Design a protein with these regions (language model features):
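Bacterial N-terminal signal peptides
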Residues: 4-14
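Extracellular polysaccharide-degrading/modifying enzymes targeting complex plant/algal/animal polysaccharides
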Residues: 22-265, 270, 285-304, 311, ...
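Predominantly extracellular beta-rich ligand-binding scaffolds that present long acidic/polar faces
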Residues: 109-120, 139, 375-512
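Extracellular beta-strand/beta-solenoid scaffold signature
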Residues: 139-155, 207, 239-245, 263-270, ...
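Right-handed parallel beta-helix
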Residues: 252-263, 275-299, 305-308, 313-366, ...
Length: 512
């Protein structure tokens, strides 16, 4: 997306709308026209991302090849003719910094890619981007599904890595995961999604609702409610098992480029404290939903997780650019860390973070960040944090609607005001924040910098599009109160920068 194209498109849409709409409805008509223009621009941008050409490999760089079509794990992996076939074989290789790992286009590589420091992972050949699937297999086989004593509940033996969802026919439909809420006083157990009593798969009662008995003494089976054998009902069934697509850990100097990551229960790319992580020209779809842990945060139900690209910890030189993330349980991109009290004054700065030229669609949060400081005197902060030239749509909608906290989705999410999010040189510019299930943004910090300066971002030339009366969210250092989206939003946003435009769609029709 050109640096000035977003503002130009929105200006043109507003002018054409005002010329064609009734005087009483000019503003909302302009908002709808602008939204339509931006969705068209995003569709074209997605086509460009998917068609990104292969990256050039430097002469003399150690290079390894994987091919689902012709590869063999007993080969040496050093040429296209002697390519490996699986991510499991790649995991056994010792890769030197400066190496390149090339996945053949058109192939599907199942399992986690374990990343080595200083290595670039990208594509070769022709056709669609190579696909990294966390799903161990396609479950559209009637013989693998067994009818239980409940005639509408079918069992599939998937093992004990928790399944975050099942995706049918490439995303035409998906399953709703049932987790159990346990009343702390009575011990009674309930379906967290419906509120009805629930003790086992026998209590499933909604089409494509499922429960996974992943517990240590459980069966390891997924139980899915369906009137018909799922293997007959669907052409493909993929499982978001509890794993990453790429497991970076603390590896420095990693580039992940030109791949598609799908059907993982945790993160598409999961990293800890690291430096020089670059993610470019990638697509992420159907990410997350697996259980992080039971009973954390004082909850009486399990907590689920799943981001397309995550660093949990400190970082320096972290870039995500020219990517498309859609249908993500948590965040499209994120850097985050809760600094433990035992860290004392140890710094976990997040420096030189840039999210640019991406398209986010139906992620609970398009961009999420937090840097929570629990120890007085810890000076950790975000520095040179830039969010620019991104197109963001429908936060909190889609797959993530099965979350228990259905009022927290936002395009930028920082979890409000508190002992968190100290920031210097934080810039949000030339983005489109379009529609959300709840609020557009939640940007907060309760910490100043050492020189007394604000941790709030500068907002420049962004476009906000929301419905009248719905939540705008907040941008604040002092209050977690959320503001409604309406006539006063423009003046509020103008306090944080110039050139921003707030366009208002008409209020949604009430369901009878």
């Amino acid at each position: 997306m050109k640096a000035n194209l977003l503002a130009l498109v929105c200006t043109l849409a507003a002018w054409t709308a005002s010329a064609a709409c009734p005087e009483s409805n000019t503003a909302s008509c302009a908002a709808q026209r602008t939204l339509d223009e931006l969705r068209a621009q995003a569709a074209a941008r997605i086509v460009e991302i998917r068609a990104t050409p292969n990256r050039a490999v430097p002469d003399g760089a150690p290079t390894y090849y994987l091919s689902e079509r012709t590869g063999r794990d007993d080969a040496d992996g050093r040429t296209p003719a002697t390519a490996w076939r699986t991510a499991a074989r790649l995991a056994r290789a010792k890769l030197a910094p400066g190496s390149y790992v090339l996945f053949e286009r058109g192939g599907v590589y199942r399992g986690t890619v374990k990343v080595a420091p200083g290595v670039t992972y990208t594509a070769y050949g022709t056709g669609p981007k190579p696909c990294i699937y966390g799903s161990p297999e396609d479950g559209a086989d009637p013989a693998k599904w067994t009818r239980t004593e409940n005639p509408n509940v079918w069992a599939y033996d998937i093992g004990r890595r928790d399944v975050g969802t099942l995706v049918f026919d490439g995303g035409a439909q998906h399953a709703t995961k049932i987790v159990i809420r346990t009343d702390k006083k009575t011990g009674a157990r309930f379906n967290k999604f419906t509120g009805r009593p629930f003790n086992s798969y026998r209590d499933l009662d909604g089409d494509l609702h499922f429960w996974h008995d992943y517990y240590e003494k459980g069966t390891g089976k997924v139980y899915l409610y369906s009137a018909q054998n799922p293997g007959e009902r669907f052409r493909s069934i993929e499982f978001n098992v509890k794993c990453h697509g790429f497991a970076v850990g603390g590896a420095d100097g990693v580039t992940i480029d030109n791949v598609t990551v799908k059907y993982v229960g945790v993160h598409g790319i999961g990293a800890g404290t690291c430096r020089d992580l670059t993610v470019s020209n990638c697509e992420f779809g159907w990410i997350g939903g697996s259980i992080q842990a039971e009973g954390i945060f004082g909850r009486d139900y399990p907590t689920r997780l799943g981001n397309a690209v995550e660093i949990y910890g400190g970082c320096e030189n972290y870039t995500v650019t020219n990517c498309y993330a859609w249908q993500v349980y948590d965040a499209g991109v994120t850097q985050q860390f809760n600094i433990p009290e035992k860290a004392g004054a140890k710094r976990y700065d997040q420096k030189n973070v840039r999210y640019a030229h991406n398209v986010f669609e139906k992620c609970n949060y398009s961009v999420e960040y937090f840097l929570t400081v629990r120890t007085k005197g810890n000076a950790s902060r975000m520095e040179n944090f830039v969010v620019e030239d991104n197109l963001m749509f429908d936060a909190g909608l889609g797959f993530c609607e099965q979350r228990p906290d259905r009022n927290e989705g936002a395009h930028i999410k920082s979890w409000g005001v508190g002992s968190n999010n100290r920031a210097k040189n934080y810039v949000i510019r030339r983005n489109a924040f379009c529609c959300a299930g709840d609020m557009l943004v939640q940007i907060g910090s309760g910490l100043k910098n050492a020189d007394g300066s604000s941790s709030m971002p500068t907002l420049t030339d962004n476009v906000f599009i929301g419905r009248a009366g719905q939540s705008f969210g907040l941008i604040s250092e002092t209050s977690n109160a959320r503001a409604a989206y309406g006539a006063g939003t423009q003046a509020f946003v103008d306090r944080f920068g110039t050139g921003n435009r707030c366009l208002i769609l008409p209020a949604a029709a009430q369901t009878p």
